[in-house]
Swiss-Prot record:
Residues spanning the membrane: 59-79, 86-106, 121-141
Database matches in PANTHER family: TRANSMEMBRANE PROTEIN 217, TRANSMEMBRANE PROTEIN 217B-RELATED
Signal peptide range in chain numbering: 1-21
Protein name: Transmembrane protein 217B
Other comments on record: Found in the 3'UTR of TMEM217/ AC Q8N7C4. Cotranscriptional with TMEM217 and seems to be only ever transcribed from the same promoter region.
Source organism superkingdom: Eukaryota
Positions in coiled-coil regions: none
Keyword presence, Membrane: yes
Compartment(s) of residence: Membrane
Topology with respect to the bilayer: Multi-pass membrane protein
Keywords from the UniProt entry: Membrane, Signal, Transmembrane, Transmembrane helix
Topology feature Cytoplasmic, residues: 80-85, 142-170
Gene Ontology cellular component list: membrane
Amino acid sequence: MNVRMFSLMVGIFSVLNTTQFFIFDLNQKTHICYEAKFSIYVDSKSELVTWTLFHRANISTGLSLTTIIIGCFLFYCIHKNIYMGLLIYAMWIITYELINFSIVLLLNGIIKDHFKTLSYLHWIFQISHMLLHFFCLPFIVKHAYNLYKESQTVGRKRRHRLCSTIAVNS
């Protein structure tokens, strides 16, 4: 298998994996009982934590949909041999995982003691998600580097051919 094929597999993996974790995030229960609205989180005095908890579904939706779109953009860039698109994908995955890690870190601090085992599940999901994404990044970067080197070689040949044509016409 060549680096291009690995990059395509990374794109497929990224879209499917992001979709899977997006579904997990949307189906996560934070309240139990309909009348009492018993929350698994304690009340926090931090505005950032409260805002993150309140807008978690919107943040997850925005990040996941952006990642899926950028994953599809990765397919296009691999097909058209655009190395800059592969680098954009790599930078986005790093940003995406750091934001998700920050959210898990913030929200695990306010989980009630009765639900602490749930925080371990959050950590396992987050760390496995990060490891899987970060394991794939070297293949993307290597393919981008190969495309960059290839474009430099083609540029030199084109300049050499253009200079030869101008010299013959003179």
